[in-house]
Amino acid sequence: MSERWALAPVEGGGALLVPLGPEGLPAGEVRREGDLVGAVRSRPEVGRWVWRSTAEIYPRLLAAGVRVERCYDVEDAELLLLGHEGRLGEPRSAAAAWARLRQAPVPPDPPPRAAEPGSQSSLFEPEPVSVPFEGLLAVYADQQRRHEGTEHPGRMRLLTAAESAGMLVAAEMNRVGLPWRADVHREVLHELLGERYAGGGEPRRLAELADEVSTAFGRRVRPDLPTDVVKAFAQAGIKVRSTRRWELEEIDHPAVRPLIAYKKLYRIWTAHGWGWLQDWVREGRFRPEYLPGGTVSGRWTTNGGGALQIPKVIRRAVVADDGWRLVVADADQMEPRVLAAISRDPGLMEVAGHDGDLYTRLSDRAFSGDRDHAKIALLGAIYGQTSGDGLKNLAALRRRFPLAVAYVDDAARAGEEGRLVRTWLGRTSPRAAGGGDDDEAGIPQEAPGEGPAVEGRGEFAPGYASTDARARGRFTRNFVVQGSAADWALLMLAALRRATADMRAELVFFQHDEVIVHCPADEADEVVRAIRSAGELAGRIAFGETPVRFPFTTAVVERYSDAK
């Protein structure tokens, strides 16, 4: 399966296709066939299909029962190459790339498509600017040349292949869907929120909590409006900057308890309530549209549906089919292990070379057995907590693991100076002058120790678009680690997809460091082994031969909520 063919759909359901040579140029005559699906199905020897967009073609193949082993997504490759060239933000469509080759006016990318609950993604894509087949071939050949001109061509080609594999996984997960029991979901909502009132108003429990908040303030207050809450506290002589839970918990006022409870339930009602259930769950499956590389760091996002923010209590509705199981796997302390691999720090690689708790081993090496201090120090180095206790802990970390700390320090310095940084495989940060929504950066925006409990999951503000040098440095410090972890995750998914190809098992969910496989009960043990093997294989492929291990904590359950 070493052949590589280019493929493009044409009107009437047909296709243009041609074999490609080693340089990316056509190695034969262009053929026109009347059935795109049949053209792919009849060529099982093709090792990689080159096409404009996976979202444009692959759902159609999957609907016909055709699965491809590998692909090359031209538009995704264009995005990665533009980023490497410091041009992130320029149009990344095949039509735009073709226009640049001809020095013609470059068309803008189509606007993002609104989420269509329960739909197959390609059916609702905005109409792209057309590009002739010869244009697609020219863009692909040019991309092969541009790969050769990158800082590490082999790594960059690997990243492109891995991201294209991620596109296949995303389309397959959308097709299969996450098992979802609507009846269980409704039971959970009734248990949490109480009865629904006619007219779409707040359910009973939210209304009760809202009344408690108002009673505590002595006047009518809308707990769903942060400005109203902040104003009410101010009138009570209490200054608050926001209504975030960690800030409210510091306040001694009778409104705090019902307000926190209200906010938690309100979030469930609006994000995963009855309306969400009606829109997004069809025939026992939740089918979000996954967007690989949806953030600049390479982490995935979804187009609507809130798949990556499913509350634990709602996970009770994620139930395996009869006779099947959910294999839920979490990568253990993934980002610290990735830092060990990319920094090549001998001491940290030795710590990360075992399957056990990394922070415990770290504490034994440098923090007199104090696991909490070890964790704060390492996450502080990654996320930029370099003051107060974080500075003291960082000094201890720097003495024992100088290469690891220097790696992220150098990345931070580059960001402060307005320079670009790259992940291990070559994904490149945006320029400091770029714009964008900080929440889309995939980078935490709350430093460890400055807000909620340290988990490396808060959020820094601003972000990569900031004109503040220190904020930019915090972004790039984390980018090189989080982005490299996202690269590893792509390779893990590709390896797992390949390992389960001959099973009935289905990849049904992925976020950051967690994967769920839905499989017959008698395949569960084999799936667990496949996940663990995929993690180790991805580590070797991404980072070479290092002592670093990439273990998973796995649980075989009937219900997602039982895994945590």
Explain the meaning of each model-derived region.
Residues 481-501:
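Short amphipathic alpha-helix segments
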Residues 1-92:
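Conserved RNase H-like, two-metal-ion catalytic cores of nucleic-acid enzymes
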